[in-house]
Every structure is written in C-alpha cells, then in structure tokens.
Amino acid sequence: MRIGQARYRFEFRLLAGESADDFGTVAALRPLIAPWTADVADSELTLLRVTEYTFRAQIADRWRRGNIFILGDAAHLTPPFIGQGMGAGVRDAMNLAWKIAGVRNGTLAADVLDSYEQERKPHTRSMIWLALNVGRSMTGGGRIGNLVRRLVLPRVRLLPGLRDMVVDSTTPALRSSALVSKSRRPRQLAGTLCPNPPLPGGQRLDDAVGAGFAFITTSPPGDADEALLRRRGVAVLVANGDTELKKWLREGRCAAAIVRPDRTVMRAGRDSTALCAWTATVLRPAAAPQSPAP
C-alpha cells in the first residue's frame, strides 16, 4: 500500500515459528518485497518499522450499564481488511454524543439512549463479518486461492453489489429503533446516511445544518409546521430545482426526510405534514436538563 509520495506498507502472513524479529533488516525482507522492489537498490530503501499484529474479531456482550457506555475498541475489534475499524469507533461516538446531549437538554427522552447499542451493535457485526470474509478472500486458499484472486479481484469493481460494499465502502443501513422509523418498503431512506452535497448558496449540507437535526423537503412547509420544527431546533432545507438533494429524495421515493445530527435518516415519507407531526412526538422543545436513567 502506498502511503504518501515515498512510503509503502507491506503486509505478510507469518508462518509457524516466525516472528517480526526475523524481518528486521532490508536484506531479510528482500525475498518478500522483491516482486515490487527488484529494480531498487538496498541503499535506496529505508526500513522504518516492522511490527507484528494479531487480528481479532470480537464484540462485547453489553455496551451499556446504567450511565456507563463503551464504544470503539472497548466495544468491538474489527480486522483491518476493509479499513473500517477506526471508522466504526467514530460512528459509535457520533451515534451516542448527540443522544446524550439531547437527554441533557431535554429534547430527547432518557430511554432513547438504549438505541445506541440497538443501532450500532448489528451494524458493527455486519462490518466485522465483511472484514473477515474479505480477509479470507485475500489470504486463504494457498496457491489455488492466489490464482482465484488474480482472476477475480480485478473484476470486483464490475459487480455493483460487491463494488458498493468493498470498493466504495457503502455502509449498511441502521435497523429500526426509537430514532429510526422504517416502513415496510424494501428500499427506503430511513436508517441510511444523508449525502453531503453542495447547496445553492455554495455551502455543503453539513456546514449549513451544523450539529443539529435537519428537515429536508421538496416543498416549503406551512407556517405551523415550520414553527413546530424551529421550536425543536430543526433546520429546514428545501430541495428544489435540479439539485442532488432533490434527486436523493426522488430516488428514495419520498417528499421529505428528517435527518439526525449523525446524518442518519430518522424517517422519510411522501407526506411532509405527517412527518412534521411524527417529529414532534420524538423531539421536544428544549426544557430543563435531565440525567439518563440509571
């Protein structure tokens, strides 16, 4: 793997009886890296680091006890084959932080904190499963496996489903929870990530909305609906014209969507007034701070 202009990272499986200490010099590494460095003299190679990793795939049984939550590597360990280990920890933090803030400022009920594990655990399990299978496809099978990899991997990008999961790093949708309301339709926006396209004013959606909720609609809401949303700190964005947001709503077969601070779609539908009314049952106007239930 190329890192920057002049650094490369190589990974090799250690055989029985071998350790990283056996490969502490360029000379010792030569047989392994020769296919990529045959024309490079030893004097032009600088060995920066040799280290040994043990890859694990683990998920904690419980992610919450009272007001104590675990996240990141404390909650799950992901093999590195799809580069999603750190990303999973960031998703944990993004999923949990705004919920705690909402409970503290009174806009969310304390029991929504249970949705952290309900949403993140199945998602993490899916990503670990994918990483394990990608790892097996990259390293298993001996000589036959090597032959299959040479034939198949260059063509992965031609298969839409695999390309989205492996090459484009498309993340699975979250399951239903107190803060993800899905319909029975097989393809829908609820639980998926909202895009971050440029808006007509030049800003991107994330910059315009900040760390709050967003109500994205193809037509402006009525005065009463807009006032209801504003009282709950929800930004209103109208996706009109030939914009990426309007195309996104159209592909999701809906006219409006309510998007969470972590940019997950909470709910979407064709009736924006009904969606506003539903939002009012989940989000409350700011009130006195409260503590999560023990």
Label every PLM stretch briefly.
Residues P35, V103-P294:
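Helical substrate-recognition/capping region of FAD-dependent monooxygenase/halogenase enzymes
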Residues V50-R56, P195-P200:
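Short gly/ser/thr-rich secondary-structure transition/capping motifs
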Residues R64-P80:
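Short FAD-binding loop at a beta-strand-to-alpha-helix junction that anchors the flavin cofactor
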Residues F81-G83, G87, M94, L113, ...:
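Catalytic cores of eukaryotic secretory-pathway lumenal/extracellular enzymes that build
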